[in-house]
Amino acid sequence: MAKVDVVERVTEIIAEVGAPLGIELVDLEYKREGRDMVVRVFLEKREGGINLDDCADVSRQLSDILDVEDFMPERYTLEVSSPGICRPLKKVADYERFLGHLIKVKTFEMLADEAGNKRKTFTGKLTGIADGVIGIDLTEGQKARVPLDKVAKANLEFEF
């Protein structure tokens, strides 16, 4: 099974296992580390936050299904955890949910803020999302608008 198919099937399984528990997938990595592949799953729970028991429960169920379906093309290690306080922002719904929070965005190419300063990293308060563009009040006092299709990576930042 191709890598993209593995990711797609594991995503489907997590949705099936997690939905009854109120748990959803934040991110999924499937990559080689050393000689083996790693399936790294990051989960969250909207109500009450995810805990170790939730992660262990999903891990057991996912592992059982992976063993039965046996579609993984090679040896792998399964890791299931929370995304942490600097969780990634992947979907439009993530940006909508975390309006007003401090974020860091890295782009594929240099983009200009409102003052014309070009950069690839934008850090500041997420002020909005509309028409595929996120608004950020930068920590330096400027504003920026970043198209989602230019975002290489985005995550929440810890506020002191």
Swiss-Prot record:
One of its GO terms (cellular component) is cytosol. Its main location: cytoplasm. It comes from the Bacteria. SUPFAM superfamilies: YhbC-like, C-terminal domain (SSF74942), YhbC-like, N-terminal domain (SSF75420). GO terms for biological process: ribosomal small subunit assembly; translation. It is found in: Cytoplasm. Keywords: Cytoplasm, Ribosome biogenesis. NCBIfam families: PRK14647.1 (NF011241). PANTHER family: RIBOSOME MATURATION FACTOR RIMP. Belongs to the RimP family. Required for maturation of 30S ribosomal subunits. This is Ribosome maturation factor RimP.
